[in-house]
């Protein structure tokens, strides 16, 4: 069945949930890609809990991510991040948004592969720059040339992100549209008929 003969939205969403079982949908990608906003929307569409790993880290540590970076350094932060993500993954199904560096950890990738389905929100540099320039809470971008930092991170991380189960190009569009494209990409990944039209599954 092709996309023009797709299932009614409810049937495909139910089939997708069935294929997920106890696994989580795990969003990966660079800062500014929209992991939290899109992840939250996907969770709503699937009636699943939404977890943001950075928020979980802040809850556990009682410190903000920038404070953790400043006080303990990136290595200690990554170790805490790994522990938190591994714990969260034990409680699927859910939708989990991870920090930009989380997927670079081999043990974290292994845990995600075992307990989830990874979704890379792939964004172009200009979109990322536009989004991150509006926020002041990005420890890795405290630089005289944040664009160069992002370019370096893209060079280092995109080949690893590309090993994700699903890749969805993101852009400056409504989150409902991107979230629906994520759901259709997951349907294709599992061999499920796509949802009829993105507008039909907005909530």
UniProtKB/Swiss-Prot annotation:
It catalyses: shikimate + ATP = 3-phosphoshikimate + ADP + H(+). One of its GO terms (cellular component) is cytosol. The keyword Amino-acid biosynthesis applies. ATP binds at residues 32-37, 138. It is found in: Cytoplasm. GO terms for molecular function: ATP binding; magnesium ion binding; shikimate kinase activity. PROSITE patterns: SHIKIMATE_KINASE. Keywords: Amino-acid biosynthesis, Aromatic amino acid biosynthesis, ATP-binding, Cytoplasm, Kinase, Magnesium, Metal-binding, Nucleotide-binding, Transferase. Its EC number is 2.7.1.71. Its cofactor is Mg(2+). Pathway: Metabolic intermediate biosynthesis; chorismate biosynthesis; chorismate from D-erythrose 4-phosphate and phosphoenolpyruvate: step 5/7. Binds 1 Mg(2+) ion per subunit. GO terms for biological process: amino acid biosynthetic process; aromatic amino acid family biosynthetic process; chorismate biosynthetic process. Substrate binds at residues 54, 78, 100, 157. InterPro entries: P-loop_NTPase, Shikimate/glucono_kinase, Shikimate_kinase/TSH1, Shikimate_kinase_CS. It is an enzyme of class 2 (transferase). Transmembrane segments: none annotated. Mg(2+) binds at residue 36. Monomer. PANTHER family: SHIKIMATE KINASE (PTHR21087), SHIKIMATE KINASE 1, CHLOROPLASTIC (PTHR21087:SF16). Belongs to the shikimate kinase family. Catalyzes the specific phosphorylation of the 3-hydroxyl group of shikimic acid using ATP as a cosubstrate. This is Shikimate kinase. It comes from Mesorhizobium japonicum (strain LMG 29417 / CECT 9101 / MAFF 303099). The lineage of its organism: Bacteria, Pseudomonadati, Pseudomonadota, Alphaproteobacteria, Hyphomicrobiales. The gene is aroK.
């Amino acid at each position: 069945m092709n996309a023009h003969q797709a299932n009614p939205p409810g049937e495909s969403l139910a089939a997708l949930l069935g294929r997920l079982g106890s696994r989580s949908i795990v969003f990966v990608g660079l800062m500014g890609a929209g992991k939290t906003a899109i992840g939250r929307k996907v969770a709503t569409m699937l009636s699943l809990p939404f977890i943001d790993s950075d928020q979980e880290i802040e809850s556990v540590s009682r410190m903000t991510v920038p404070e953790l970076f400043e006080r303990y350094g990136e290595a200690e932060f990554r170790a805490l991040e790994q522990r938190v993500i591994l714990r969260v993954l034990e409680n699927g199904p859910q939708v989990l948004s991870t920090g930009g560096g989380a997927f670079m950890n081999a043990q974290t990738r292994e845990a995600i592969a075992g307990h989830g389905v990874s979704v890379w929100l792939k964004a172009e540099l200009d979109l990322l720059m536009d989004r991150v320039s509006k926020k002041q809470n990005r420890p890795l971008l405290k630089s005289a040339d944040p664009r160069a930092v992002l370019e370096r991170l893209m060079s280092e991380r995109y080949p690893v992100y590309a090993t994700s189960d699903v890749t969805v190009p993101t852009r400056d569009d409504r989150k409902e549209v991107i979230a629906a494209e994520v759901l259709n990409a997951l349907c294709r990944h599992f061999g499920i008929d796509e949802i009829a039209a993105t507008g039909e599954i907005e909530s």
